[in-house]
UniProtKB/Swiss-Prot annotation:
InterPro entries: M3A_MIP, MetalloPept_cat_dom_sf, Neurolysin/TOP_dom2, Pept_M3A_M3B, Pept_M3A_M3B_dom. Its cofactor is Zn(2+). The keyword tRNA-binding does not apply. One of its GO terms (cellular component) is mitochondrial matrix. Its EC number is 3.4.24.59. It comes from Malassezia globosa (strain ATCC MYA-4612 / CBS 7966) (Dandruff-associated fungus). The gene is OCT1. This is Mitochondrial intermediate peptidase. GO terms for molecular function: metal ion binding; metalloendopeptidase activity. Binds 1 zinc ion. The active site is at E582. The keyword rRNA processing does not apply.
Amino acid sequence: MLSRHLTVLRSACRVSHDLRVPSTQAVRKSAWSVCYSRRPLHISRSDAASTAALDMGVAPAVEKDHEILKELLDTRHSSGHVLSQGVPTGLFQIDHLRTPSDFLLLAQRTLIRCQLLVQRIARAIGNPSELARVVRNLDRLSDMLCGVIDMAELVRHAHPDQGWANAANDAYEYLCNYMNVLNTHTELYDALRCVMETKDIYHSLSQEAQAVAHIFMRDFEKSGIHLPPHERNRFVELSDQIMILGRAFLQDMSTGTSDTIVEFPTDLLDGMDTSIFAQNLFRLRPSKSIPVVPGSWELHYISKYAPNPQARRLAYMISYTGRTQPVAVLEQLLHARYELAKLTGKQSFAEMTLVDKMAGTPEHVLRFLRLLADAQRPVAQRMIAEFGQLKHALEGSSQVEIWDREYYADAYLQRHHPSQLAPLSPYLSLGSIFTGLSRLFYLLYGIHFRAAETLPGEVWHPDVLKLEVVDETESSVIGLIYCDLYTRDGKPPSAAHYTVRCSRRIDLDDTHLDMELGASADLPPVADTEHLLGVKGATGFGRPGRFQQPVVVLMTDFAPPNIGHGGACLLRWHDVETLFHEMGHAIHSMIGRTEFHNVSGTRCATDFVELPSILMEHFLTDPSVVALTAHHHRTGSPLPYVQLQKHLATQRSLDALDTHQQILLASLDQRYHSERAGAPTFSSSQELESLQADMGLFPPVSNATWQGQFGHLFGYGATYYSYLFDRAIAARVWEQVFAKKPLSREAGERFKMEVLRHGGGKSPWEMLSRLLHEDKIADGNAGAMEAIGRWGLGQNQSNETISAHL
């Protein structure tokens, strides 16, 4: 998933840095001498993979980089880290970010520098040459702030040193407070509005610049800047209230049940293996009951394995009914969002949110979800009917309740896939997967990964691996990926992609005029700019001028290398899916190198941004990609594809149920953010019960409070449909562009040139229309949404492909 942050003038702010890239020759020499001077490099295990890659068209010099990368990741002595003996530097090679105390100083200097630029923009009205630069200067302002805010966002979550984490948090909050001021800065808004209303200036802007102008305008108006003063003040109050309620909602989710103990009768557990409870529970309560916490793993275990239906029912009711506190907070949040939308003249929060998304309106989203549900429901209902047959055989009743799902899903799997599956992990070493990804990107887009040295002080943990992304046509580094791969105490457990620096053209910056045109007696003097994130940039990228190089961080929580596996980190299949997914985001950032910070890479519509990452999941299971990627960590032998097919057939057995549940949740999200939330009698539990009766596969449960654990209602309010939407698009792109020849450079170039390179600087509907040669969807109207709904999610075709190979 993408990291989601607070923003400045934009709904998806990312971080930027100054990272000076050492020469290719120096990096390769240093990497070799530092890591391999004590022993020779053995590559015989990967000969089969290298031979296959060379046969498919990977250049020998590129494959040499892959051999080094694999050795780094699959040998314990290096942990994937290449450390230079060079001169110490600061975090991310920012020389003046060497200690935690430097963070707030950097933020303070950045704020002063931004104030100059704000004054310059505010004074642009009446000066045609300055008006023509307003959009670029707003983008530069956003880039300045994001350069510190998003770096701080990463460091406060990733840095193991609490001093650094606290300092990053202080800098983050300091600049976010200023960011909130800018979002309601009327003079900035007036300058932008003047640009858009002055036709000769507006039409002189490039397509990208016009897109950025509209983005800024929408974000200003979403902040209520066009409202009368008293309504604007109310808008700010509601926005603050929404943030407070959202944090409280998430806090209640994670800690709200920790002090709630419920006694669970032990006689209901007869017939199931309770040895897993022995040390923790039965030792403390040897007779009539055991203490359980709502939502705990113990209750989930009971739901899945207890033969007694009363045990399963009780486990469900303890976890998903009666938790009124988070539901009360959620309903306050939903009502505050409704009131906020009404202030801006919209009928609902969903209407306000979707205006700049591909879907456009709540009605379009609901139509899309209904089409998906109609296609998915028959398959899911057949599965529930089989659950009923299994239940009738065991219990004498064929009525499947919601608390029966996990138990009979397990029974269903045992019936259809009774044999033990051979493990995949021996073929899924971290080194093999990374080199396979790099080979895939080289064949598709002409880019590959090369391990690079890090200077002392550059990274936040010794295990962080730095990768250069190298383009064959430019023979140069086009971006950097820092990989923080292994689990550790205090590190977030989920995978994420952080954009640390966006692409932006910098040779057109006339920063010397900021002081001349923005200086004010009210501002403190700016002694220098050496503490700011000045970026020298690079030429190339298929465009004129100098650009910031994109930099991203890929964060996962994989198990560290195991000496029992020869020092290799062996992944589970789910880990590989995660890595492919997140690398889809990373490559979007690398290729989406635009002139403007606000539309580069993954800075595009929420319901479009997952397309490249979901498309990567299609590549992952293709035989030709598996041949590039999965090889035994000891012998180098390729993963037998039939072995993977059996695994996938089992894994996807319940896809119909899971997909139907996602459709239901996306529909619930739309209901909660509709005008219903403004009704005095609004009840989120009643809405959930009504939706279950309308669309659900199981009888509804009265007074359910499950929605109090649906955390995405805060972070993805009114946009939870996006993942399903992009699944449908990705399935179509795979089928139309890649399925016949997955490793085709022609297909890769087509996707790169029509989609990836534009970031968010072009209409997603226009990009898709050109990519798929489907003119009827270019306008993104109701018909286009219906077309995508009718495309479906593609899983039936995938399952048929798997079955055909078995």
